[in-house]
């Protein structure tokens, strides 16, 4: 897993990227937390292209839609329901992605009231024998706040196969 903004501040990730993607290709799971548009060390930190945007969902109570309700990220090992998005603090997510390669799956969507739906908060792709996940949801706020649903979702990401 890479931390928030790692591809903005850790310049050595540019050289380490082939090793990280080899890890995924050989059966590993890599979860990349959000990055900003500015000063990315790579055009796209994933195995397939996507772009980072300034899109965000700032209303923490904004509904989350299950675009792919049978997706493994929403079912394994924890069954995720709308209740798992209750009690979030400050916002849902930030720097959502756009213009992603069709090999990425987008199991979730959300938006602030009166704004268009945003699908780019969570990208999931099989790469070789492994899984690559890019997440724009704000785990760095939800986990320290002890939001139970955030822990369930996070566990699903790190255990994805």
What are these regions (language model features)?
Residues 1-51, 116, 129, 135-142:
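Helical hinge/lid and interdomain linker segments adjacent to catalytic or ligand-binding clefts
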Residues 12, 56, 149, 153:
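Short acidic-hydrophobic sequence patches enriched in Asp/Glu that either
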Residues 23, 76, 156-160:
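Residues that form generic nucleotide/phosphate-binding pockets
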Residues 27-29, 52, 58-62, 101-103, ...:
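Short, surface-exposed, polar/charged, turn-prone segments marking secondary-structure boundaries
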Residues 33-127:
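An acidic, glycine-rich "communication" segment
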Residues 119-122, 134-151, 155-161:
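Short, surface-exposed patches at the edges or C-terminal ends of soluble domains, predominantly
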